[in-house]
């Protein structure tokens, strides 16, 4: 049946009698049947889970937090997760294979957005569960547009109320849950904070309920199906987006030109491609300061990914 983080609709009024503060929010959720209780499943489960939502609700941060490794580019700029990226979370009782999709866009302003919207639909076509992520502050018009897409194509949908750490009065979440269940028959509604790591185990528990009994698809040590080269390119692009902010259009792309890896280290040469000559000084910065910082931050993350010393060169080039 339909559940609000573990409770049926007729039981939810009982929770409204509790007066909550930030400190006893966890206690409220424990009373609702979530807590830290873990059920040991006899049969191993495995399946695909899509993550959808409008831009900037924390989809990539959520996957990174659950998987425990950085698998999806995160940025304050929307539309930076351009391709389907799988993140694999493996436990003793289940393996969840996450399909991270771009945020559903309300207007097709470019071929890029059209491609991204097609990617959303493709991702929903062959998954066992869907995480629909919205901001715990409440529903927005773009959330409603995503919901229309789910009405047509989704199977088992869990509503994730993210960023609960930013909601001072946690009691406000209860009417939001009731409102949400009126909009769509969600399999469960789970409030979380991906940034702070709150309620993630409970979310994983709800996902596992929707997965079929199956042996794991991937080796336990794997956390993404993307190659190190792909993740390195995404890492460089992420640093560029973070450091350049609103200065750079979305045409920026990264290509790995050379990749020489040994047991002791890796030498990587990458190109940051921009659409216009006038974009080059924006990326390079005064006396090369921005490009050096992009390279420095990316090199540190790539070295951590590979577990070895990394020499990284990044060049800025213009598409001709």
Residue ranges and their predicted role:
Residues 69, 88, 92, 104, ...:
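Conserved, well-folded catalytic cores of nucleic-acid-processing
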């Amino acid at each position: 049946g339909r559940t609000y983080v573990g409770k049926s609709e007729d039981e939810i009024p009982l929770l409204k009698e509790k007066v909550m503060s930030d400190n006893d929010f966890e206690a409220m959720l424990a009373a609702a049947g979530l807590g830290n209780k873990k059920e040991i499943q006899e049969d191993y489960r495995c399946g695909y889970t899509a993550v959808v939502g409008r831009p900037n609700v924390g989809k990539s941060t959520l996957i990174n937090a659950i998987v425990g490794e950085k698998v999806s580019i995160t940025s304050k700029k929307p539309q930076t997760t351009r391709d389907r990226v799988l993140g694999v979370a493996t436990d003793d009782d289940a393996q969840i294979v996450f399909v991270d999709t771009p945020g559903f866009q309300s207007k097709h302003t470019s071929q890029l957005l059209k491609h991204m919207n097609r990617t959303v639909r493709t991702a929903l076509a062959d998954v066992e569960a869907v995480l629909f992520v919205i901001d715990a502050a409440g529903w927005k018009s773009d959330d409603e547009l995503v919901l229309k897409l789910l009405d047509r194509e989704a199977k088992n949908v869990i509503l994730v109320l993210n960023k609960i750490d930013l909601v001072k009065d946690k009691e406000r979440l209860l009417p939001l849950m009731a409102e949400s269940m009126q909009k769509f028959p969600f399999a469960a509604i789970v409030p979380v904070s991906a940034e702070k790591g709150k309620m993630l185990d409970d979310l994983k528990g709800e996902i596992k309920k929707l997965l079929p009994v199956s042996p794991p698809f991937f080796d336990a040590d794997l956390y993404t199906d993307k190659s190190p080269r792909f993740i390195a390119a995404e890492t460089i692009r992420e640093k560029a987006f973070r450091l350049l902010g609103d200065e750079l259009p979305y045409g920026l792309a990264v290509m790995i030109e050379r990749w020489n890896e040994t047991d002791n280290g890796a030498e990587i040469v990458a190109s940051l491609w921009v659409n216009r000559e006038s974009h080059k000084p924006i990326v390079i910065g005064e006396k090369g300061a921005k490009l050096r910082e992009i390279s420095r931050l990316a090199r540190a993350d790539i070295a951590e990914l590979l577990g070895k010393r990394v020499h990284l060169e990044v060049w800025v080039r213009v598409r001709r």
